[in-house]
């Protein structure tokens, strides 16, 4: 592997969730927390690094390269609508598993309004209870895997770190299409009620609250981001 094929942004680690209660996140964008491996992905389709073809590097949370998902890399090249991208996302088999393989035990579901109250009012859990839900789970190359793009850190060589999250997501939508191997993460704004039961039924354990105006700080905690567990009963 020559120097031009080496990843450029290994020092940029995914931004971490903060230590605050979700109720303190101002003007949140709310999204299901994917079960999978948190990664950053760099793509270049023109320039010195792409002389022999598109350059794609998938990096784990330690900045080490993951080379076991060529179909995902090829899928990303197919749907990219910019000459270079740096993406925050997840490698997951959750899309292909579907609800029939949900790991959530079958229990009686509360009413939708009760779900929201339990999460926001009765959710006096400590942060350490959520730590396992944040932990990145290594992706398995033996099963169908999808890249879920949830944030955009750079486009066409221009850093977006100081661009508000909502605008970063809008830009992501404009520069990344979708296919079998690449999807954009979904997000909603309050009220949550129409979404909680649906998300839980298809296998999500937790949801992320991210301030719409938050900036991105690679490798650091951001108290504009928080996690809440979806109540199970």
Please identify what each model-predicted range represents.
Residues 1-233:
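Catalytic cores of nucleic-acid ligases and guanylyltransferases
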